[in-house]
Amino acid sequence: MSLKIRLTRGGAKKRPYYRIVIADARAPRDGRFIDKVGAYDPMKAKDDPARIVLDNEKIQSWLAKGAQPTDRVLRFLDAAGLAKRPTRNNPQKAEPGEKAKERAAKRAEKAAAPAEDAAA
């Protein structure tokens, strides 16, 4: 049985509230879970300590048993110092795409053409 540490949504419409739970990976998002290990309230201010509540002892024991946190939960655990999130490296992210390069080349040609006409 593959275990995940993930969020289950609660709350009302347009007022989300998430529980951080241990659940089987095949279970539905808001379905059956094994243990509740925390809560996340995105409606609270970012600097509010009650925005993310974690039970550190339970989380550490479940991580030791092999439970895998989802990406969002891993961010919370990394901020709390319970787990290390690997850094991602995408050197091509800052590069413009092919179409943007083509547009820039056309703009450069158009800018160079009037300058040549003025010099002649």
From Swiss-Prot:
Positions with biased composition (Basic and acidic residues)? 95-110
Alphabetically, the GO molecular function entries are: structural constituent of ribosome
Q: Example GO biological process term?
A: translation
Q: Does the keyword Ribonucleoprotein apply?
A: yes
Which region ranges are annotated with the description Disordered? 81-120
**UniProtKB keywords:** Ribonucleoprotein, Ribosomal protein
Query: Any keyword Transcription?
Result: no
Q: What residue intervals traverse the membrane?
A: none
Q: Which gene encodes it?
A: rpsP
Query: Which domain of life does this protein belong to?
Result: Bacteria
What InterPro entries has UniProt attached to this entry? Ribosomal_bS16 (IPR000307), Ribosomal_bS16_CS (IPR020592), Ribosomal_bS16_dom_sf (IPR023803)
Source organism phylogeny? Bacteria, Pseudomonadati, Pseudomonadota, Alphaproteobacteria, Hyphomicrobiales
GO CC entries: cytoplasm; small ribosomal subunit
The name this protein carries in UniProt is: Small ribosomal subunit protein bS16
Q: Which PROSITE patterns match?
A: RIBOSOMAL_S16
Q: Low complexity composition bias: which ranges?
A: 111-120
Please report which protein family the annotation says this sequence is part of.
Belongs to the bacterial ribosomal protein bS16 family.
